[in-house]
Amino acid sequence: MEQLKKIISNIPHEIKIIRPLKKGLISEIYLCNFNNIKSVIRLDLETPDWIKIQRDSEIRILDLNNNHKSEKNILYHDLEKGILIRRFIEGNKFNLNKINSDQQLELLGRAIKEIHKTNYEKDAINNFSNAINRYKEILKYKIQKDPILEIGFKMYEDLNHESYPKVFSHNDLTQENIIWNRKYVFIDWEYAGLNNPLFDIASIISSYSLNDQQIDSLWRGYGKKSDVDDAILRKWIKFTYFCDYIWRICLIETSIYDEKFLNLDDLKKNLSIFYKFV
């Protein structure tokens, strides 16, 4: 708490911490008042350079988003000190309600489509391939010793050569990053950038374990089912699990965390079922 007070005291604005919201692997998040605006402050823990690069990308994305809105969402940031303050978004983490799941998923599909229609200058935003290449560089001495890494990177190489046009994508559509309050709001944009649109769709499918009927509802909202090769989509779904593993191994290699802390054994067991199908 003393460290938190010290950080707050060096921010040239009036800030009052209300309560902690979340402590993650790389950051702590608090509800606060910032100049009498209900807000969220995210304080990065000691983070490796590859995460700082993604934070820089997030700030640029949020600044671009600010330019498209009359009311600014991002209120303050200091990349060097790992500080981000944004308006608090009212709502709840989106949980799939089985009673209304078809309607919910159609609306979610439409919301994802709106992300993918966003038109930013290509040189202003990150490219997902750059992130994968950074992971590959970090893990270059481990890939040949770890079949999961080898399969994961090879799978991405194959998928990245598919003919789908790259679009602006969120690239981290997990349950933690989707909020519902009469519409969908997406948070945590540090991985956002140009990517195959199927990665966002696949992330939703794997995160919520959607069945075929639910996937059809998601596509109805998105409006592109007829153009999609189901085999390619299934491969992207598999890749989301490998991507999670790659990210965790990068964190282990560059931070204080170990395999046990990051529950790597459970993820390895889940990934093992894919080996014979890759």
Mark where each language-model region is.
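An alpha-helical support segment within catalytic cores of ATP-dependent transferases
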Residues: M1-P12, T118-N171, Q175, D265-Y275
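Conserved N-terminal boundary motif of the eukaryotic protein kinase catalytic domain
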Residues: P12-P20
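ATP-binding pocket architecture of kinase catalytic cores
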Residues: R19-I125
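Active-site acidic catalytic loop and adjacent metal/ATP-binding pocket
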Residues: E28-N33, V40-I41, Y156-F199, Q213
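Glycine-rich, phosphate-binding/catalytic loops in enzymes
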Residues: E58-I59, D102-Q103, V185, A202-I205, ...
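A general structural signal marking secondary-structure boundaries and capping sites
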Residues: K69, I112, H116-Y120, L159-N160, ...
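Active-site activation/catalytic loop segments of kinase-like enzymes and analogous catalytic loops
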Residues: L198-S226, K238-I256, K269
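Short, charged, amphipathic alpha-helical segments
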Residues: D258-D265
